[in-house]
From Swiss-Prot:
Cofactor binding, per record: Binds 1 zinc ion per subunit.
Record NCBIfam families: cysS (TIGR00435)
Matching Pfam families: CysS_C, DALR_2, tRNA-synt_1e
Protein name: Cysteine--tRNA ligase
Amino acid sequence: MIFYNSLSGKKEEFKPIEPNKIKMYVCGITVYDDCHIGHARTNIAFDVINRYFKYRGFDVTFVRNITDIDDKIIKRANENGETTDKLVERTIKSMHDAFDKLNILRPTKEPRATQTIPEMIAMIETLVEKGFAYQGTNGDVFYRVAKFADYGKLSKQNLEALEQGSRVDVVEEKENPMDFVLWKMAKEGEPAWDSPWGAGRPGWHIECSAMSKKLLGDTFDIHAGGSDLRFPHHENEIAQSEACNECTFANYWLHSGMVKVNAEKMSKSLNNFFTINEVIEEYHPEVIRYFLASTVYRSEINYSKENLDNARASVERLFNALRDIEPVEVNLPDDASEYEEKFIKAMDNDFNTPEALAVLFSLAKEINTLKTVNKYKASGYAFLLRKLCDVLGILFTDIEEYFKQGDGIDVSEIEKLIAERTQAKKDKNYARADEIRNDLQNQGIILEDSATGTTWKKG
């Protein structure tokens, strides 16, 4: 298995620290607002990778943190006139609900920053003792970037150039403009914890260093996150952790590509910013997940109606292949292993989901060909298709339920119209019955009458 390591800037063969075990840390969200489509992209990317590791037989400890104390959280809570605790709990529930809808597995462990304060303080104390941190004139504790010789090794940036670029941002309480905060002194009305430097709260970067150390150890296999976190967040994590622990922080670094909207950067100022729940109002979660998983994880992905409509068509092709066929493992044909080997070859090469999906569509084509001539063999291929779809986390909805739910379709309204049509037929009002059938057909809903009643599906 090889994948791109952001630290080395090239593809490398993956060698876990412990055989058959993987320890992986993914930077989670700062819980001050509902998750947006960019969060979905990052978390689906690493969910697919997590699922693939498990499929390949690894025992995965997958840690995804929650940043539950931050300037943004405090600001939003004040704007809402509520406590930070109330905002945090509501936002975490919203996150879980959205991720569950997208079939994102819950992490093995989901630490909160506020539950790891003692470990953060201990790390900062060690950094101060070793000369990597100091207390500024305003009481805040800062990391002394110039003392860490390898600063910039992840983002491939030169410290001297960074320092020159930040001269305009000179802050008197710091020795160097590049120094970043480890501990912030308390402000009136803000959450605070006691520390050797006075009451305050941690800086963002030390939170992840402490949480990963607590749950995965000083050195672990994989650290991952969105490409926007590579600098300064991940660079600062390395500086803190390696100075404190005197060993490699993470052996492999994975970064997911950003979401663009109609080829533009997604941002609230451009009014092209969408929450997960807003997108689900227009597209089924199956479609959203397929769309976000269909591009190689480290590439940018373009969010557009055209691309989502194409994803919907692809999802329906896969579902249609599994329609009217019962997946049966014992019926696996002898040549089924060839499909699985191609799938593994694709995913073993930097988690190449487009190539993996091409294998699934080849399987779907085979199933469709065999349905009417060899249902036994078709059911074996259907089992394999289901199995491999599960590795990517797609086709998680019941087939008939998917076609009933559709996109933006009001199921209760359809059922109501079917009941009205049934009554119209009983009343011999065939004109009204035909009108209802035609109206639904124009919406892409096909009615099927039988002796037991009327069923419907998307056309």
